[in-house]
């Protein structure tokens, strides 16, 4: 995408804007406390030097205290011409930089890392692939979170691996049955790993009536079988809890 000119990026080192020969960019916080803060002067000068800041004025500070980064936010950012990401270090940055420059604070999760560069890389990678021309729209439409649900399981050759066979429906050529199987498996995975997304889809009105009916049949373990004697059809097999002896 970079070679094709679809996207471009630039890296700015705030140490290049420090005032002393040691390129000092941090100091102890007022009021005491552990750790160091990035100094406002070199960071501010670094931001002033960025052409994207001059053009768009859209600056993001990557911090654990920011709003959660989501696929929806990534899609929103992908439509902007340019964005600027501030990568924090140590205990963070001076609040005055946030007040003066920052438009939004974003967090990639409820955990703390040693620096913001890795978090910024996550945001960049998530956003740039949504830019027109980077990845086909069909691939994006079927990914996890693009339709409020996690993506269904994927299989490729060989047909049998370590005794495990690819579900026969996927090679049946019946596109409608394949679609139903994928929706079913997507719902199954979402209910197991991220049930909150189901509720969100209901709230947003993106969960279809077909999906709701499938959810009504799901238990902890659901399998898909292909009836060879009749036309391909979905058969939902509910798991039974084994007698624990209690």
Language-model segments: residues:
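Gly/Ser/Thr-rich beta-alpha loop segments that engage phosphate groups in nucleotides
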Residues: 34-37, 68, 90, 94, ...
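S-adenosyl-L-methionine/SAH cofactor-binding core of RNA-modifying enzymes
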Residues: 37-89, 95, 132-133
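Structured adenosyl-cofactor binding patch, chiefly the S-adenosyl-L-methionine
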Residues: 97-143
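SAM-dependent methyltransferases
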Residues: 158-246
